[in-house]
């Protein structure tokens, strides 16, 4: 029986892989800054990755000050990073500096050999026509799409850039000929990361998300992966969905975010 706990590090690492795809990575003291040129205003377009916890813990106040100044000089709209396995002192320092945080729960599942009985299908977004049509999925929707505001055209441009140069694939979720939403995957060794599951409001609560996660389990098997996983914001509908899908909550990380003056 596969011990899913050992894939928790792969799930955490998959976020760093995602943020680096299509990004310009600049070394800073204690971290790297991953920026996607022209799309820095998106949350995933400007973020600190590969944070060196030892450097931060030993000099956290000065690190926060100098890093904030550097990002402001570069014109970054925010300072955003993920932390886990840290002492209480650093989160306290971040809160004092005006950072907001949220907990993301990491769910892991086992590949499934049998193809699930599903009414939905996944169409990979590959051609120029596919990408040009994809922003229509988000039109008419008010509020954040993936937890953050962002123009649909820009979000799709970010997806396209990341999908064009690495192990990431993006799919449109279809029911018959109707497009209901989208989802992406990233291959990280023997692990399959599921990313950015989105359903239009009129298709939520109809069991489509559960079918998609079942398809992800079978896709992981087809790709000969040992496990697959995804993150959900604590207390969100996604957390309930992944629990219903049989995935196990086996790790977590905390996102820290602070807008910067420009």
Question: Where are the regions a protein language model picked out?
Answer:
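A conserved beta-strand-loop-helix scaffold within acyl/acetyltransferase catalytic domains
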Residues: 150-200
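Conserved GNAT acetyl-CoA-binding A-motif
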Residues: 74-83, 220-233
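Conserved beta-hairpin
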Residues: 25-28, 92-100, 167-181
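Conserved active-site alpha-helix within GNAT-family acetyltransferase domains
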Residues: 87-101, 206, 210, 234-252
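N-terminal charged segments
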Residues: 1-74, 86-87, 152
């Amino acid at each position: 029986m596969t011990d899913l706990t050992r894939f928790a590090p792969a799930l955490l690492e998959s976020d760093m892989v995602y943020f680096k795809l299509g990004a310009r990575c600049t070394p800073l003291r204690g971290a790297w800054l991953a920026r996607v040129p022209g799309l820095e205003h998106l949350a995933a377009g400007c973020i600190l990755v590969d944070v060196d916890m030892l450097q931060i813990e030993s000099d956290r106040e000065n690190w926060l000050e100098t890093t904030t100044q550097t990002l402001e000089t570069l014109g970054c709209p925010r300072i955003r990073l993920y932390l886990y396995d840290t002492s209480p002192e650093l989160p306290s320092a971040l809160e004092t500096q005006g950072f907001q945080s949220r907990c993301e729960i990491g769910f892991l599942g086992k590949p499934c050999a049998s193809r699930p009985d599903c009414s939905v299908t996944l169409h990979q977004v590959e051609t120029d026509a596919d990408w040009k049509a994809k922003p229509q999925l988000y039109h008419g929707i008010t509020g954040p799409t993936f937890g953050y505001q962002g123009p649909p055209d820009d979000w799709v441009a970010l997806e396209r850039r990341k999908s064009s140069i690495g192990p990431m694939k993006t799919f449109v979720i279809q029911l018959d000929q109707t497009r209901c939403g989208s989802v992406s995957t990233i291959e990280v060794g023997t692990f399959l990361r599921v990313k950015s599951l989105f359903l239009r409001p009129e298709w939520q609560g109809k069991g489509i998300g559960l079918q998609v996660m079942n398809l992800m389990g079978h896709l992981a098997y087809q790709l000969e992966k040992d496990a697959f996983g995804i993150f959900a914001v604590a207390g969100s509908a996604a957390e309930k969905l992944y629990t219903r899908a049989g995935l196990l909550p086996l790790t977590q990380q905390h996102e820290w975010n602070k807008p910067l003056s420009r």
